[in-house]
Amino acid sequence: MDLKPFARTNPFSGLDCLWCREPLTEVDAFRCMVKDFHVVIREGCRYGACTICLENCLATERRLWQGVPVTGEEAELLHGKTLDRLCIRCCYCGGKLTKNEKHRHVLFNEPFCKTRANIIRGRCYDCCRHGSRSKYP
């Protein structure tokens, strides 16, 4: 597969990681784009996030901010939006949860987690299948 056309359309290609300052690999740049991250600007430089640093950052968030379990209904009331309109990210990989992933939480009575500054986190399909990553601690 030729990655030249991809490099022109991906805003993360050629950027460094915000935390480790290493250049993003093509896979990391692609993941940033697919997970709908925003390019971060610090001191005039543009940054993305490599997978290792992102997962370390999310693990630190889980350790430092004890999450409070909330239902989908409570999350809606807290933010004044329907679950479908809320931006909820995975607490393990940082990807945006799809409507189906949010509805899976409700269907299986798996709570979302309210963390720092009322940020709502959940688990995406990739991070909850096969029991590979537990529910939010």
Curated annotation (Swiss-Prot):
Cell compartment(s), UniProt: Host cytoplasm; Host nucleus
GO molecular function: DNA binding; zinc ion binding
Zinc finger (unnamed): 17-53, 90-127
Keywords per UniProt: Activator, DNA-binding, Early protein, Host cytoplasm, Host nucleus, Host-virus interaction, Inhibition of host innate immune response by virus, Metal-binding, Modulation of host cell apoptosis by virus, Transcription, Transcription regulation, Viral immunoevasion, Zinc, Zinc-finger
Domain of life: Viruses
Keyword Protease assigned: no
SUPFAM superfamilies: E6 C-terminal domain-like
Matching InterPro entries: E6, E6_sf
Pfam families: E6
Assembly and interaction partners: Forms homodimers. Interacts with ubiquitin-protein ligase UBE3A/E6-AP; this interaction stimulates UBE3A ubiquitin activity. Interacts with host BAK1. Interacts with human FBLN1.
Family: Belongs to the papillomaviridae E6 protein family.
Function field: Plays a major role in the induction and maintenance of cellular transformation. E6 associates with host UBE3A/E6-AP ubiquitin-protein ligase and modulates its activity. Protects host keratinocytes from apoptosis by mediating the degradation of host BAK1. May also inhibit host immune response.
Protein name listed in UniProt: Protein E6
